[in-house]
């Protein structure tokens, strides 16, 4: 009776209450506004962090060349351009297909332009830059698995839309082909843009590497139509690794550990395994992928309540956009391993200087990514049990008070919920 009276009052006032799904979409729209007003730079790349008024301090060409603060660009605002643009592009393609406005189309195009730039600025075949500095082309020497993998995912998803012209479609296909061929020549090792700064290997025997190589080769054969990629894809999936296991078994097992620090890149893997699951026609392989989705989701579910421990900064004193404050410590680096060791020492300083970002990294990011992992699974009971907590987290988030860009995963989460609800 109360609900009927409430709706009648709303009608009299000319205001209709939002349905459950509309509430989530409305919150995703708020996040979208925040991301595009503050976090997407002039080079169409997402910054890791910015101030509440859009303050950002970009590395200069001299600083990138000198590996300052480190050759990975960790803790700078251009640390994760390939990673973030690729995964956000997935959500923006979904958003566009849900609401085909010129504005949403343009957002997809801009993210694609950013990913193309990351391939263009380097001089080493197979290199995908993490981001670009103050001149729009300078960049750090090291890339990683986590920059390359979302690059494939994002551009592969883009080609499924009706956005690209025939010329743009062909250009994108050629870029994906060129990247695949370059990595294959390197035996699937991820190159840096200088010698000794290689970081990552897709033929490794851990879960993430197995998902990366399986998905990249799937994207390659779907977008190019070339049989050689299809053949390689299935050889790798059914083949054995150095530890004697088949890759399909490794993927089915899911990640050995699910923790707050790993949920963000493992959510990307869950999205990729779902692609493999939905597109596979071999019943045996489909069972392996279903097992992977299930195992990963079950391990992630306990991370969703992390958001309750998140405490937004009450003022602006908990953040500085100036990453220079973490120097010292600094030391020259000869390779990627030295760069990573230096970066971990620097993080201790940076986390003290910007505790607001550290709070978001530790509590909010893993909760959003874990929720997406669960939503991507085929486990109806698990999703049903998690939904009350997921809804509270989504509806309680105020993106206007956040500094660290990974709250964009809320859009990925809501778009997936919307698609699965309409099935």
Roles of regions detected by a PLM:
Residues 143-218:
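Aromatic- and glycine-enriched pocket-lining scaffold segments that form the walls
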Residues 76-90, 142-153, 204-215, 261-272, ...:
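Aromatic- and histidine-enriched alpha-helix N-cap/loop-to-helix transition segments
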Residues 21-41, 164-165, 269-423:
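Terminal, non-catalytic domain-edge segments
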Residues 21-80, 109-110, 114-131, 167-171, ...:
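Low-complexity, Ser/Thr/Pro/Gly-enriched N-terminal "stalk/linker" regions
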Residues 5-15:
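Bacterial N-terminal signal peptides
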Residues 203-210, 222-292, 389-404:
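Long, leucine/valine-rich, helix-dominated scaffolding and oligomerization segments
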Residues 45-76, 124-144, 192-212, 250-275, ...:
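Carbohydrate-binding/catalytic loop surfaces
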Residues 73, 77, 83-97, 110, ...:
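Non-membrane alpha-helical segments in proteins
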């Amino acid at each position: 009776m109360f609900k009927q009276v409430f709706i009648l009052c709303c009608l009299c006032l000319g205001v209709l209450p939002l349905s459950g799904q509309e509430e989530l979409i409305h919150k995703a729209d708020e996040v979208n506004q925040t991301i595009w007003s503050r976090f997407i730079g002039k080079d169409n790349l997402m910054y890791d962090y910015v101030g509440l008024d859009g303050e950002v301090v970009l590395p200069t060409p001299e600083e990138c060349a000198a590996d300052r603060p480190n050759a990975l660009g960790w803790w700078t605002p251009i640390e994760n351009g390939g990673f973030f643009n690729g995964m956000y592009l997935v959500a923006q393609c979904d958003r566009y297909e849900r609401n085909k406005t010129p504005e949403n189309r343009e957002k997809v195009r801009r993210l694609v332009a950013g990913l193309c730039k990351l391939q263009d600025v380097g001089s080493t075949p197979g290199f995908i830059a993490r981001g670009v500095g103050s001149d729009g082309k300078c960049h750090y020497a090291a890339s990683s698995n986590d920059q390359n993998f979302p690059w494939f995912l994002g551009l592969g998803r883009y080609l499924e839309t009706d956005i690209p012209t025939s010329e743009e479609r062909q250009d994108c296909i050629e870029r994906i082909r060129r990247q695949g061929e370059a990595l294959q020549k390197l035996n699937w090792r991820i190159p840096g843009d200088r010698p000794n700064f290689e970081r990552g290997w897709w033929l490794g025997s851990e879960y993430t590497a197995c998902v990366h190589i399986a998905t990249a080769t799937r994207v390659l054969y779907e977008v190019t139509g070339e049989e050689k990629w299809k053949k390689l894809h299935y050889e790798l999936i059914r083949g054995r690794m150095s530890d004697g296991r088949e890759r399909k078994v490794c993927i089915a097992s899911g990640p050995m550990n699910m923790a707050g620090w790993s949920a963000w890149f493992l959510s990307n893997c869950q999205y990729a395994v779902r692609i493999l699951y939905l597109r596979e026609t071999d019943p045996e392989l489909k069972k392996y992928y279903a097992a992977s989705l299930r195992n990963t989701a079950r391990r992630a579910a306990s991370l969703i309540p992390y958001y309750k421990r998140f405490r937004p900064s009450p003022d602006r004193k908990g953040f500085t956009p100036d990453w220079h404050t973490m120097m010292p410590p600094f030391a020259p680096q000869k390779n990627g391993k030295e760069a990573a060791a230096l970066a971990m020492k620097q993080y201790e300083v940076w986390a003290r200087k910007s505790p607001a970002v550290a709070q978001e990294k530790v509590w909010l990011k893993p909760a959003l990514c874990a929720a997406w992992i669960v939503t991507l699974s085929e486990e109806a009971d698990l999703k049903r049990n998690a939904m009350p907590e997921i809804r509270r987290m989504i509806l309680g988030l105020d993106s206007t008070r956040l500094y660290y860009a990974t709250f964009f995963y809320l859009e990925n989460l809501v778009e997936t919920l919307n698609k699965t609800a309409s099935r």
